[in-house]
């Protein structure tokens, strides 16, 4: 663990309780003499705290140091992924986070699984997964998450995003990944959706194999950092 997340990190004093307390003081057995590095995952600063008190159900921390320390990928990457199974989204989130993806937009394509609902509770769970990933890899800013109800909404929001499809030019490392790369579901895009893409750059993955949506995400995120 590179640091501990706390939404109020930077305050002169902090209280650690609940799941964080159990993890730090019962699982990891942090001692009172230890100092802890904390982040709020918003401002890029690393805050160092010492212990003022460790009680049975909470710990009180006192701020003793601050340093600017941003840890992010060199290039920004925005993936626009059609909704796939929730368990598969949760599985790839830590990988995308470690590869420096700056934003993940989810949308319901024509062939998306409609029984998979992306609501505020799901987005909150996704964010929790990302927080744990940041604590492990050291990333200093959270990945942005959002959801759209259909393809046209996503296209309207990102008019310069390119599309990953079977028929297109080989995806170059020089592509503008910050503008967004649209990745379809397992069944690909419908003919109607392909009609929406006529004015956009279309790319394909330079492999003879057909990748799952989650594999395509990891591939694009990796290429973006070359």
Curated annotation (Swiss-Prot):
A Pfam family this chain is assigned to: PUA_4
Annotated compartments: Cytoplasm
GO molecular function annotation: rRNA (uridine-N3-)-methyltransferase activity
Main location: cytoplasm
GO process terms (BP): rRNA base methylation
Catalytic activity: uridine(1498) in 16S rRNA + S-adenosyl-L-methionine = N(3)-methyluridine(1498) in 16S rRNA + S-adenosyl-L-homocysteine + H(+)
Keywords: Cytoplasm, Methyltransferase, rRNA processing, S-adenosyl-L-methionine, Transferase
EC number, UniProt record: 2.1.1.193
InterPro entries according to UniProt: Alpha/beta_knot_MTases, RsmE, RsmE_MTase_dom, RsmE_PUA-like, tRNA_m1G_MTases_N
Cross-referenced CDD domains: RsmE-like
One GO cellular component term: cytoplasm
PANTHER family on file: 16S RRNA (URACIL(1498)-N(3))-METHYLTRANSFERASE, RIBOSOMAL RNA SMALL SUBUNIT METHYLTRANSFERASE E
UniProt function note: Specifically methylates the N3 position of the uracil ring of uridine 1498 (m3U1498) in 16S rRNA. Acts on the fully assembled 30S ribosomal subunit.
Family, similarity comment: Belongs to the RNA methyltransferase RsmE family.
Full protein name: Ribosomal RNA small subunit methyltransferase E
Gene name of the encoded protein: rsmE
């Amino acid at each position: 663990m590179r640091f501990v997340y706390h939404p109020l990190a930077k305050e002169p004093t902090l209280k650690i309780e609940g799941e964080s307390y159990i993890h730090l003081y019962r699982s990891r057995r942090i001692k009172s003499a230890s100092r802890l590095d904390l982040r709020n995952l918003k401002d890029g600063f690393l805050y160092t705290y010492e212990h003022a008190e460790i009680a049975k159900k909470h710990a009180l921390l006192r701020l003793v140091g601050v340093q600017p320390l941003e840890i992010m990928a060199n290039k920004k990457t925005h993936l626009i992924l059609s909704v796939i199974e929730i368990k598969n989204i949760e599985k790839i989130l830590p990988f995308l986070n470690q590869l420096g993806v700056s934003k993940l937009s989810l949308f319901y394509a024509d062939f998306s699984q409609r029984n998979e609902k992306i609501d505020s509770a799901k987005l909150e769970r996704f964010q929790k997964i990302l927080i744990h990933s940041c604590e492990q890899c050291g990333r200093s800013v959270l990945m942005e998450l959002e959801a759209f109800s259909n393809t046209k909404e996503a296209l309207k929001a990102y008019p310069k995003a390119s599309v990953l499809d079977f028929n297109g030019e080989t995806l170059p490392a020089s592509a503008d990944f910050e503008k967004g790369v649209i990745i379809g579901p397992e069944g690909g895009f419908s003919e109607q959706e392909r009609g929406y893409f006529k004015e956009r750059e279309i790319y394909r993955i330079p492999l003879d194999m057909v990748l799952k949506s989650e594999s395509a995400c990891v591939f694009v995120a990796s290429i973006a950092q070359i």
